[in-house]
Amino acid sequence: STTETMGVLISYHQTFINAVRATGGRNTYRTLVLQGNEKYLKPSNFPTDPTPNRLAYEWHSYSPISFTILKNDPPVEWDYVRFYWGAGNHSSIEPGRNCTYGEEDELMAGFQTVKKEFIDKGIPVLLGEYSAQRFNSSSKFVPKEMDKHNKSVDDWITFMTKQSMAVGIKPFYWETGGVFDRVNNTVLDQRSFDAIVAGTK
């Protein structure tokens, strides 16, 4: 994201608001959700809405990306895939796979920024996407300390869920069939499921 591209996105948001409000009925006052990078899209440059106090903000967070979604090492990607996140979960066996950014303090600061910029100004916020990949023995990359890797994923999920709720953000875990089998109504990844639930307590 850049200031220039965010300006284009804001113009799209304005078109969206105008189109919805113009249809009348409940769409006159329906809450509308805007997405964008929190560094550039702020209440001060929100598009104009003729209905006051009916805009919400959606935020996605996959930090640190090298831990949550990165699939390949350099030279294919810009960083190495990281297996270990959080205090007490770093590996002494393969330290090159430890996270080097995006750990608790940095993520906490991000939540506080969003709270200050949006929640404290009365703008509802959704954490519309967050999740972390979990490696296993059949993965392309196999952590040498699998227990620490699994705990890293558990702790990240719980942390993100808990901190979201603590500052008034509603979290929505990004789930594409790896955690739940919606056809048979069963849980496929009990650890991730339990980690989400733990974050709500």
List each language-model region with its residue ranges.
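Short secondary-structure boundary micro-motifs
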Residues: 101, 109, 146-147
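Well-ordered, non-membrane alpha-helical segments in soluble/globular domains
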Residues: 9-15, 107-111, 151-158
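Active-site region of glycoside hydrolase catalytic domains
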Residues: 1-102, 112-133, 166-167
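Alpha-helix initiation/capping motif
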Residues: 40-42, 103-104, 180, 189
